[in-house]
Each structure stands twice: as C-alpha cells, then as structure tokens.
Amino acid sequence: MQTQHTKVTQTHFLLWILLLCMPFGKSHTEEDFIITTKTGRVRGLSMPVLGGTVTAFLGIPYAQPPLGSLRFKKPQPLNKWPDIHNATQYANSCYQNIDQAFPGFQGSEMWNPNTNLSEDCLYLNVWIPVPKPKNATVMVWIYGGGFQTGTSSLPVYDGKFLARVERVIVVSMNYRVGALGFLAFPGNPDAPGNMGLFDQQLALQWVQRNIAAFGGNPKSITIFGESAGAASVSLHLLCPQSYPLFTRAILESGSSNAPWAVKHPEEARNRTLTLAKFTGCSKENEMEMIKCLRSKDPQEILRNERFVLPSDSILSINFGPTVDGDFLTDMPHTLLQLGKVKKAQILVGVNKDEGTAFLVYGAPGFSKDNDSLITRKEFQEGLNMYFPGVSRLGKEAVLFYYVDWLGEQSPEVYRDALDDVIGDYNIICPALEFTKKFAELENNAFFYFFEHRSSKLPWPEWMGVMHGYEIEFVFGLPLGRRVNYTRAEEIFSRSIMKTWANFAKYGHPNGTQGNSTMWPVFTSTEQKYLTLNTEKSKIYSKLRAPQCQFWRLFFPKVLEMTGDIDETEQEWKAGFHRWSNYMMDWQNQFNDYTSKKESCTAL
C-alpha cells in the first residue's frame, strides 16, 4: 500500500519528467542561434539583458580581408564558407594609433580599441531581440574617431539594450581608418581613397542582402553615427550608390560639410606623397609608391601618419574622405547646394559643449587636471593652433566677436569662448547648415540640443556636456544593473532610446503617438529644435544663429580682405558693427514674432 508521502514523491517525479520533456520555446533552440546568410552559416550566442535575452552575432565577416595586394583597394566581396562561422566574440579592430595622451584615464581610454589590431578587421555585429522578430526595423551604427580611430566592439556601442528594450535589430561594423582606410591617389583603382567609406557601403549591402534572415526588414533601415560616424552618415546621403541601402539617417555631432570632414583631391594626394616620403617610398610613379607602401608593416605606416601634418596642428585629420569622382563626386557643400542628396527623413543634433574635448589635447593653458583658466594671450595662441594659415585679421575677427564684443574679459570668459569657437566652427554650425539645406529640399528634418552632463563623466566639470557623451544614453548604458547612474538618467536614457527607435521605425521622433512635448519639424525658416535633458524638453528656434551667421557670411569676407592692414581693420570693424546690429535687430524681431505666434496658438 502506497503512503501519502510516496504518492507526493511520484507526483513530483512526474512533474519533473514533464518539465524536461516540454519545449523551452524557440529562443532556446539551436535553430535560433544558427542563421544562414548568403555566404554561409553563422552561430550566435544568447545574452542576458534586463531580465530577458537578446541573440548576438559578433564578428561576422562581410568582406575579404584587405591584405597584401588588397591593401588600399576597395573592399572585395566575400567568398562562401562551407562550415558554421562562430560569431560569438568581437573580431579584430582595424589598425589605428592609440590615444596615449592620458594613460590610465578612463575618459580617454574608453575610446581605445579593446580587441587585437589587424588589417583583417572587416567584420560586423548583429543584435536581435528574443523572441526573434519578423520584419523588425534595423538600426546600423557607424562609429566616430575622426576617420583615424574607432572600433565597433567598444562597450559604449553595445547594441543589446537597444535591441532588448525597443525590439529593433542593431548592427555595427568595423571600417578601415587612417592611411589604410583613406590614403588616396584619386583616380587610381589601386589606391582610390575613401576605402573606409566603401567598407561601410559594403556592410550596408550585406545588411540589405541578409538582414531578413535575422528577422529584419531591409526596407526599414536607419543608419546612425556620431562625429566622423555622423559625417559618414551624411556622406551616404550624398552618394547615389548608397541611396537604396537605407531608409533614414541620424547624425550626432557631425556632418560632411564640416571643415575637417572632406579634403580636396589635390590635398589628399599631397598627404599621400608626404607619407610615401616618410616611409621611404618616394618613387617615380604612383604604382611604384603604392607597391612600396603595400610592402611596409602596418605599424610603420601608423608611426609615420602623424608626420603628414605639422605637430602643432590640432583637430586636423591626416587621412580622411576626399572627392574621388566615385563615392563622392564633389565637395559636400556643393552637392547640398545643387540638391544632390537622398530624399529621406533625418534626425540631427549637437551637444552643448562640443569644443572642450579637443582643447585638452594641446591648446595652450588647457588641462583636464585644473579649471583651465586661460589668459588672452593663450586664447590667441589657441586660435593660431586651430586656424593655421588664417591671417591675423581673420583671427582678430574671431577674438573680437567671441570676446571683445561682449565687453567682459576674464579667464573663464576666454576658456568658454574658445570652447564655443571650436564647437561652433567644427560641429554645431555645419550640422545646422546641413540640416537647413536638407530641409530646403522638402525633406523632413528634426534637430536636438543635448544638454545633460552624465553623472559618471570622468572629465572635469568645466568641460560641460562634451562631444561624444550622448552615446551612452542612446545605447542605454544607464539601464545596466551594475552601473551607478542616477534613476533620472535611467529614465532619460529610456526616453532617448525610445525617441531614436521611433524615428527609425516611423520617420518621426514622436512615433505614432504624441508625448508631453511634441518634437517640431526643423524648417529652413523657423529652425525649431528640442532640448534633451533630464528635465522637461523645451522647444526653441534658431540655435546659435548669430554665431553661425558670423562663420557663414562674415568670416569668409574677412579672409578675402587685402590691402593696408589698418585701413582694412577699420573697414571690417565698421562692417562688423553694422552686421551685428542687424543680427540683433533680426533676432529681437524674430523672438517677438515667435512669442506672438505662440500666444495666438494658445488662444
């Protein structure tokens, strides 16, 4: 006779048998971790995220390794592989010089590559939600780094939170940087230039051909990037071969019309000749030079890249995009002016203190270890470094506009003014101009002004809301369980992720439903933008309009002035006063118009 205890034991045993026999759901099957692409099968891995999982495929090859005779050439399509490729860890990073300015300092070390350096580096990563979606929106990340550095394997670019929370598929790719990615003999197929951009383009072609197998929608692809990554995104908007490869674009703190982004072909060729000279490859013809440069160890090329430009030049890019007649047929501002741009929706934005990240890398009087309270002389020396080749008159115009015109002069004013000069000229004003031109062509555009300084930022307080430090909120790092962001920052990051994903899915940051602050479309006339911070977002118009008008209209005229310096100086100062008075009147009238319009709307 069975006891009650025996019956209970048998019942428990049967329950365990049933549990073991039950299917655990599709997310736990081998089928979900192995996906067949056009070039072969890849095996991913399951990642725990926020109480759930995502499936990650890390280090999928998308091109032949650009080794030997393929160095300096466009990327070549991949051959099929017979076995299953293990895509379970990040691949090599592309060769690049490491930032050693502040050894051991997290603020700079976080951007250095965290995998082995190799020319065999053309790999991409895919994060997909669980359960595996059908026809999900795809977001493809392009990293920044001035076209000299960067890798997709950095923790700050981890796509798992975005995939898990917003149920989008996230993709990122490595592309060649520095001379190995952008050395150019324009017109020569053995070293045409823009190889790094062609890498990106081939990765986007891979996404088009394969993303459906991962549950993605090839007709809903948003490319997004920061700094040189944003400039890359805007170059794809100007490249007809890239048009079919994506749907929408997000540009964070960068654009291709910025003064650092694209070089004229003559300048690109001259820099290649200079590198050839320093590596002992000065030869009679281009092919001999290319052959010699291909024979060099990549480390030797890296060592000599830094000699291509003067040692005191800051914010200069040794090797970057150029007009090659193929990927890029003209300078970006010309193509924008001619309306030769993809019809699409774009989301663009900048951070409050874009210039500070560059000042600590050599500007006189600046340091990450103090308050960088600089003198007038150091401000002027800083202008000399950031504007080499600009006449004394041109630099005097900048000094007068950003400092003297305000009347107040103190170390803080000089420090903050140089931050504004560098940020306005290189990031903010070009981004606004790109957005304005894009909007003039009847494309929907949206603009943001990022105002939140991360509580975990290792850089000093005076550096403010720095270049690059919105990225951690876009990728959801504050949601991690073992991080010490504030609760407000976690909420803010979720809001940013929702906004970016809404834009990717629907072409509008508000998505299909309204929220507390409706994000207005940016038009070339009103130029409305939204502030992003942990408080309530606000709508404003004409971000830094007087400063950007100075760089767009007044500064070029000053550079053209010749003749007697005293007479010319008097002439530009008089012209400047007339111009600034006009700008102030215009700003006041516009503000009056805006307030009256909003009052009428509220009735």
From Swiss-Prot:
Alphabetized UniProt keyword annotations: Disulfide bond, Glycoprotein, Hydrolase, Phosphoprotein, Secreted, Serine esterase, Signal
Superkingdom: Eukaryota
GO CC entries: endoplasmic reticulum; endoplasmic reticulum lumen; extracellular space; nuclear envelope lumen
Positions of disulphide bridges: C94-C121, C281-C292, C429-C548
InterPro entries given in the database record: AB_hydrolase_fold, AChE-related_enzymes, AChE_tetra, CarbesteraseB, Carboxylesterase_B_AS, Carboxylesterase_B_CS, Cholinesterase
Compartments, record wording: Secreted
Distribution of this protein across tissues and organs: Present in most cells except erythrocytes.
Active site: S227, E354, H467
Effect of gene knockout: No visible phenotype; due to the presence of other cholinesterases. Hypersensitive to acetylcholinesterase inhibitors, such as huperzine and donepezil. Treatment with the acetylcholinesterase inhibitor donepezil causes convulsions and death within 3 hours of dosing.
The EC number(s) this enzyme carries: 3.1.1.8
Protein's GO biological process: choline metabolic process; learning; negative regulation of cell population proliferation; negative regulation of synaptic transmission; neuroblast differentiation; response to alkaloid; response to folic acid; response to glucocorticoid
This protein's name: Cholinesterase
Source organism (scientific name): Mus musculus (Mouse)
